[in-house]
Curated annotation (Swiss-Prot):
Gene3D superfamilies: 3.40.630.60. Belongs to the ODC antizyme family. This is Ornithine decarboxylase antizyme. It comes from Caenorhabditis elegans. One of its GO terms (molecular function) is ornithine decarboxylase inhibitor activity. PROSITE patterns: ODC_AZ. Interacts with ODC1 and thereby sterically blocks ODC homodimerization. Pfam families: ODC_AZ (PF02100).
Length: 159
């Protein structure tokens, strides 16, 4: 799949990533209880999550500023999506750009959409929409240890 990114992202992706261009805050998002905040965090141990280029966060934020992203291992990109993510208002082009970036630039093998299980219905809303673009529910017995099936509903997309 060839990547068609906007010129802002294309210029940045041509630069080499060095240590200063890596966002260390992506190893874990702090939990927040402030009004308006999404109210969840990645609760994986620091050694499990991998640093990503700042460019990754910019591309994810172009889809939705409320999404959080990290890499689990070398070949899996995980995106935490708030339970109240509206279906409307998400740019289809930006979402496809994100999937292409994960494949072409980050060389990921899969993208995980992670939802708090207690706060969503897997057959409605945004999880339902993701099924139309090729995301499939992740088998409960395949959940990463730090994203337990009791707490998270995960959908997987093979890039």
């Amino acid at each position: 799949m060839s990547s068609i990114l906007s010129s802002n992202f294309t210029n940045k992706s041509n630069q080499l990533v060095n240590e200063s261009a890596v966002d260390s805050s992506l190893t874990a998002s702090p939990c927040s209880t402030q009004p308006g905040d999404v109210g969840w965090c990645f609760d994986a141990p620091h050694g499990v999550l991998t640093k990503l280029p700042n460019e990754t966060r910019a591309i994810v934020s172009a889809v939705s500023p409320n999404w959080r992203v990290t890499s689990i291992g070398e070949k899996t990109l995980a995106i935490m999506i708030p339970h109240d993510q509206p279906v409307l208002g998400i740019s289809k082009k930006n979402f496809v750009d994100l999937l292409e970036f994960a494949e072409d630039k980050l060389e990921m093998e899969r993208v995980l959409a992670v939802f708090e299980k207690a706060r969503i219905n897997p057959t409605e809303g945004f999880p339902r929409t993701l099924r139309y673009v090729g995301f499939r529910p992740y088998a409960i017995d395949e959940h990463p240890v730090h994203l337990p099936a009791e707490k998270y509903f995960i959908m997987s997309y093979k890039v």
